[in-house]
Regions:
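Well-ordered beta-sheet/strand-loop patches within structured domains
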Residues: 6-29, 105, 122-125, 151-468
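Short loop/turn hinge sites at secondary-structure boundaries
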Residues: 59, 85, 89, 110, ...
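Extended, domain-scale alpha-helical bundle/helix-rich regions
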Residues: 113, 129-131, 142-144, 155-158
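Alpha-helix capping and helix-coil boundary motifs
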Residues: 85-92, 132, 146, 184-185, ...
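Cationic-aromatic interfacial patches
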Residues: 5-128
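Eukaryote-specific, cytoplasm-facing alpha-helical/coiled-coil scaffolding segments in long proteins
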Residues: 126-138
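A sensor for short, sequence-defined functional sites
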Residues: 144-146, 173
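Sec-dependent bacterial lipoprotein signal peptides
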Residues: 1-3
Length: 468
């Protein structure tokens, strides 16, 4: 009787573990979590009312939490109407107890850890040329759902308070929830529900009113945030086959007029077939260097096989025409990506700017440098400006330029500058997101198809699947 209430359908592995001994205990004692021989506990109604309000408010399906059945069963108990519905008290109470316990643990655990596992994003794309290897794009390792605490709290006196405390407290989630309260548009509600799920994962989330840089891929936008101001700019991000990974790091230093050491996969796919073509290498200002000796090799003496041997380095000279532009912003990460200037500023005028091999190109590189170096002295910023071939704005800078007009470009007044303290960086993926300047929720297209993945993974909890 009780076993059929639980069933196996729709139960996650964590839920199965939490309820491993539940049936045996109930069958032997006839004393449940929500009732004993004196009747149903007083807070069963409070917990049910909370779930009936908050589950649909989060865009979730009430049936996935057994709420219609729980509501009917609890009403029968209150009215002592067992005979009129043809069900015995010995059948209904265990069913009510089992469903309400499962709803409690499912909601509390889902809100604390998420209703789906985001690691699925790292099994979307295969490495080019090797279908057995997946490309990692989600650079987090969130904690797996743990029902232990919820299974304990459901038996304690403060169980409603614990349920309430399970809700994510991030400002992004709260903003999305307010928007959900205000909109009746079905498509927007589905989009909001997907983005609310992102807020539940046990990963680093941006904090309100903190000095930080946010890059939101669907918005194709960067915001550099201080407590009292926001610098915004367009970005170009990774193309669909070479997605920009989602990560949390901190910008630690910037490099002015960088040489671009071309990654091996780009050499393989875009450079190697030009081996021996001196015009191509001259036009792109590429050079070939022996990694062991440091010698620059003649283009005509290097074959495609040589370029792919791993013994040579192909790099692009610093200055005008360099693909990284005039400045790069470095931060620790597992993908060798960075934020950088570009030699193609016209790309920022495009509506869709998924163009790169994974790095993020920024529209206002000097302004971003000024944000990062907020405490730098005037000459440091002027040195960066001159090294980027930007017009000087100080008398000292103008005098320096007059004295060095004949010097070779690019100027190298400054090559590296530490960012102290490091500035947190979040590369995010939200298709509904509160604009850091206005607070208004803005909706963006699902450029990488990640929303579709979440929607598919959450069918069991969103009402789009009957298998629970």
């Amino acid at each position: 009787m009780l076993t059929s209430c639980w069933g196996g359908r729709g139960m996650t592995e964590a839920e199965q573990s939490a309820f491993g001994t539940y049936v045996d205990q109930m069958d032997s004692t006839l004393t449940g979590v929500w009732f004993d021989r004196m009747g149903v506990s007083e807070d069963a109604d409070s917990v049910l009312a909370y779930l009936c309000r908050e589950v649909p408010r989060n865009g979730l399906d009430t049936a996935a939490f057994f709420l219609p059945q729980i509501t009917r069963d609890l009403e029968i108990v209150h009215q002592l109407a067992f005979d009129s519905v043809g069900v015995s008290i010995n059948e209904l109470l265990p069913r009510l107890d089992a469903h309400l316990t499962k709803a409690y643990i499912r909601y509390a655990t889902g809100q604390r850890y998420g209703f789906m596992r985001p690691r699925v994003f790292n099994r979307m794309d295969h490495k080019v040329g090797d279908p057995d290897i997946f490309v990692r794009v989600f650079d987090y390792d969130p904690a797996a759902p743990d029902t232990t605490e919820a299974a304990k709290k459901v038996r304690e006196s403060d169980r409603l308070a614990y349920l309430v405390s399970s809700v994510p407290s991030t400002y992004i989630y709260q903003a999305l929830l307010r928007e959900m309260d205000q909109t009746r548009d079905a498509a927007k509600r589905r989009q909001l529900a997907v983005n609310m799920e992102r807020c539940r994962w046990q990963i680093a989330h941006p904090e309100a009113n903190k000095r930080q840089i946010l890059v939101n891929i669907p918005a194709q936008q960067l915001w550099a945030i201080n407590s009292d101001s926001v610098l915004d700019m367009r970005i170009c991000c990774g193309a669909v086959p070479t997605k920009t990974p989602l990560l949390h790091s901190a910008i630690s230093y910037l490099q002015v007029n960088p040489e671009w050491v071309i990654p091996y996969n780009i050499v393989k796919n875009e450079v190697a077939h030009h081996a021996g073509d001196s015009a191509f290498f001259v036009r792109n200002r590429y050079s070939i260097v022996d990694k062991e000796t440091g010698d620059t090799l003649p283009v005509g003496h290097v074959s495609a096989d040589d370029l792919l041997s791993g013994k040579l380095r192909v790099s692009q000279k610093a200055g005008v025409g360099n693909s990284l532009g005039r400045i790069v912003f470095r931060f620790p990460n597992n993908f060798s990506i960075y934020l950088h200037d570009t030699n193609n500023p016209g790309a920022f005028q495009r509506e869709r700017r998924t163009l790169s091999h994974g790095c993020v190109r920024v529209q206002k590189p000097f302004e971003l440098a000024c944000f990062l170096l907020a405490d730098a002295d005037e000459w440091t910023l002027e040195s960066i400006r001159l090294s980027m071939d930007l017009p000087p704005v100080t008398d000292r800078g103008r005098n320096w330029l007059r004295q060095h007009e004949e010097a070779p470009r690019p100027f190298k007044l400054i090559s590296y500058q530490d960012v102290k303290p490091d500035v947190p960086l979040y590369i995010l993926y939200y298709t509904a997101f509160p604009n850091p300047q206005t607070g208004a929720i803005e909706y963006w297209p699902d450029l990488y198809g990640f929303d579709k993945v979440i929607t598919q993974e959450m069918k069991w909890i969103s009402g789009e699947s009957s298998n629970r």
